[in-house]
Amino acid sequence: MSKQPSISYKDAGVDIDAGEALVERIKGVAKRTARPEVMGGLGGFGALCEIPAGYKQPVLVSGTDGVGTKLRLALNLNKHDSIGQDLVAMCVNDLVVCGAEPLFFLDYYATGKLNVDVAATVVTGIGAGCELAGCSLVGGETAEMPGMYEGEDYDLAGFCVGVVEKSEIIDGSKVATGDALIALPSSGPHSNGYSLIRKIIEVSGADIEQVQLDGKALADLLMAPTRIYVKPLLKLIKDTGAVKAMAHITGGGLLDNIPRVLPQGAQAVIDVASWNRPAVFDWLQEKGNVDEHEMHRVLNCGVGMVICVAQDQVEAALASLRASGESPWVIGQIAEAAEGAAQVQLNNLKTH
């Protein structure tokens, strides 16, 4: 008989009991997000979901995303309550731009050592995001992987599926010269540009928990959860039928995201003076001495979503969005692009 001690999975760094405790903690979160189309609860091998009634030619739309290095900031600040909403927002906002209603969401949480309290806090945030988006949290994967991540550090990924009527897909093909561009405000940098943001914090030596901007701690401004635009945009589509294109302003800012929904030969002319840039972006620009063009190439600079409608639909669109509690404004219009011109023209750029 070998005298070698018996080695358990726990000895190897994986605590099955902790994983099971987490599942129990988050069952209520998932239940709060349930849609009638979802069949069964958490814990099965696969999640089942019917297509909602009323669709004639339903088209499924899928997306996956993470929250980038905003997660590193969350870990450094030990602030985990809103990063889950960020994760949902990054996925569902990408779906709604083609007119899709998000149906269900799954998450992947990987860590070196599972901290049940932290993981439950993150998943509670995911559930809150799903409620804001009107989709069901139907499952996920929690992977405890010692040796792959340092201590209780974790990484997140989200996966979402939505549905849209085939004849009502919004793809930008109807965008025409003279159309108006309407913007919706962001809550801050959302979930993009955080490698630049963290570098600026490092170089400036700023204590972001002590720095105050507009009466708020810089840390809170940087960790403000990504806004979820799903319900106001679905209402806008239903109210007006006027939406020709939408762009979720993520990594790449206005310069890289608007062209993704423009047809050949169209140019978006944006008036940067049409909104007051939130103080957090001015602080980042000043402390990092960031070029103005680079600001708009990396960060959203206060714009979370851009919507294209015909000029004669502007007032109806603004009214619908305001009725949903949004603060929209006209940010620019569509022009015919000169040969070789960029698809986005930024006018009235700041000089500093």
From Swiss-Prot:
GO biological process, one term: adenine biosynthetic process
InterPro entries linked to this entry: PurM-like_C_dom, PurM-like_C_sf, PurM-like_N, PurM-like_N_sf, PurM_cligase
Keywords, in A-Z order: ATP-binding, Cytoplasm, Ligase, Nucleotide-binding, Purine biosynthesis
Pathway: Purine metabolism; IMP biosynthesis via de novo pathway; 5-amino-1-(5-phospho-D-ribosyl)imidazole from N(2)-formyl-N(1)-(5-phospho-D-ribosyl)glycinamide: step 2/2
Location of this chain's protein in the cell: Cytoplasm
Assigned EC number: 6.3.3.1
Reactions catalysed, as given in the entry: 2-formamido-N(1)-(5-O-phospho-beta-D-ribosyl)acetamidine + ATP = 5-amino-1-(5-phospho-beta-D-ribosyl)imidazole + ADP + phosphate + H(+)
Cysteine-cysteine disulfides: none
Origin superkingdom: Bacteria
Principal location: cytoplasm
An example Gene Ontology molecular-function term: ATP binding
GO cellular component, one term: cytosol
Family, per entry: Belongs to the AIR synthase family.
Stated name of the protein: Phosphoribosylformylglycinamidine cyclo-ligase
